[in-house]
Structures are given as C-alpha cells and as structure tokens.
Amino acid sequence: MDARDIILRPVVTEKSMNLMDDKKYTFDVLVSATKTQVRNAVEEIFDVKVKNVNIMNVRGKEKRVGRYTGKTARRRKAIVTLTEDSNDIKIFNDNKEN
C-alpha cells in the first residue's frame, strides 16, 4: 500500500495546532492502518524521524435532517511525535501574495 493512501489529511484544530509546538502532529489515517504503517508513511512522505505514534478511533456521530437520522463516517486519528533532531513538518504554505 502506498504511503499517501495511509495518511488521509492533517487534522487542523486549535488543540492540534498547540501540539505542533511540541513536535506532535495529528493526522486522519486509514481506518485499517496500524502504528507501524503510520510511522513508515510519515517518515517516507515528510522525510522526518518519528519517535512515537498514538492512535485513536473516533466513532461517527448521529446526525438528523428533519425526521431522518444517519451517522457520520467513523475515522481514525494518529498523533505522531517527532524526534528532537527532526525538522518540522510544513503543513501550510508560507507563500504570501502582495
């Protein structure tokens, strides 16, 4: 499986942005992905060294539209901690157009 198939998208919330100061990056990953697969994918895509990987499963929430109920999709989040000597991961472009 390709590394870009495992890492779906970065999670951009206030909490995850604060964790970036401690070299912890949060990603939505494939529901069937393991810690080892996430570690190898992050190291391959971003060219960094991973110290630790924590994974959590997020259940889908029930949503209603009128009288019809449904559920949002379940997902899996991975918090990846980088080593101290690793470079930071650039999630956002720093290009500013004037």
UniProtKB/Swiss-Prot annotation:
State whether keyword Nucleotide-binding applies.
Answer: no
Annotated Gene Ontology cellular components are: ribonucleoprotein complex; ribosome
InterPro entries (UniProt xref): Nucleotide-bd_a/b_plait_sf, Ribosomal_uL23-like, Ribosomal_uL23/eL15/eS24_sf, Ribosomal_uL23_CS
Q: Which SUPFAM superfamilies match?
A: Ribosomal proteins S24e, L23 and L15e
Q: What keywords are assigned to this protein? A: Ribonucleoprotein, Ribosomal protein, RNA-binding, rRNA-binding
Source organism superkingdom: Bacteria
Biological processes per GO annotation: translation
Protein known as = Large ribosomal subunit protein uL23
